[in-house]
Amino acid sequence: MPRLRKSLKARAPNLAVERGLWDAGHKIVVGVDEVGRGSWAGPLSVGAAVVPHDRRVYKIRDSKMLSEPEREALFDRVANWCEAWAVGHASHLECDELGMSEAQRLAAHRAIAALGIEPDQVLIDGNWDFVGGGNTRSIIRGDATSLSIAAASILVQA
């Protein structure tokens, strides 16, 4: 596995947000992150990940902070570590037809549905709730702070 750059060592996401939710009774916490910009850059994709309460995988970072070889090296470890994960897509045609906001929502719903489990809480990277449904929490720079969002960010880019 490639060694992480020194600048990444201090920026490890953790399970603090997830632990708070688990302690409050939310057993299934899903982290989501999106990649892509629709018709001018291909499909829009949203990753969803459920991480275990009792095990960690080290070297997970916000995927934007990892080089492509680092992301590729982490992919199998992250995929095997997650209790569940999925990626949902909205095609460039759906992005054109629905608009980017609705296409992002569609891709998120597809990813969450593909998990095969009903989430108690969904953590979203960013400041906009593109999932909807009331059981969501938007976290600015969530991929740098929440381990489930960081896992989703790695899985969606593979």
Stretches with model-predicted labels:
Residues 1-158:
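RNase H-like, Mg2+-dependent phosphodiesterase core
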